[in-house]
Amino acid sequence: MLGLNSANKSPRIPDGFVLLRSELISVRKINRLLSRCNQDTHQPRKLELALKNSDFYLTLLQKTSENLVGFVRVTSDKGLNANLWDLIAEPGDQQEKYMSIVVFKAIEIIRRELPGCSISVAAPLISLNPLKANGFLLDPNGIKTMGFRR
């Protein structure tokens, strides 16, 4: 859940990188990054369908190599809730920075285009610091979430 007092400054995108919104991206690149982050990968067809049915997704790419270094996908019911999925960033010393870039931009878009929606995220532990830095609260007021996996 996102706190009300989260007016952070936009993290600077490093030189040589570009942040794109809903630009065609290979599901293989997303799965490769998920794997490098020790996250579950998705069946290519299901991931393609998820991208198609998302409200938007953000990709952070190195310009010269077109390597995917950050990703998040957003869905919403367009009324009450917006959800961040598959929040990942290239492992290494810049991982938190890359994550902060995609999280900040996702929040900015949600606030502008889906005002009033509460924002939730299912994310790995490594993302806790960037999420907190962008105003997320861990289990506010004792609220716990659950997920179902088949």
Language-model segments: which ranges?
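Conserved GNAT acetyl-CoA-binding A-motif
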Residues: 110-124
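Short amphipathic alpha-helix that is part of the acyltransferase structural core
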Residues: 2-45, 142-145
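Low-complexity, intrinsically disordered Gly/Pro/Thr-rich segments
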Residues: 121-136
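A conserved beta-strand-loop-helix scaffold within acyl/acetyltransferase catalytic domains
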Residues: 42-64, 68-88
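Active-site/acyl-donor-binding loops of N-acyltransferases
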Residues: 132-150
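Conserved acetyl-CoA-binding loop-helix of GNAT-fold acetyltransferases
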Residues: 95-109
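A short, internal acetyl-CoA/4′-phosphopantetheine-binding micro-motif in the GNAT/acyltransferase core
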Residues: 87-96
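Beta-rich extracellular carbohydrate-active architectures
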Residues: 108-111, 136
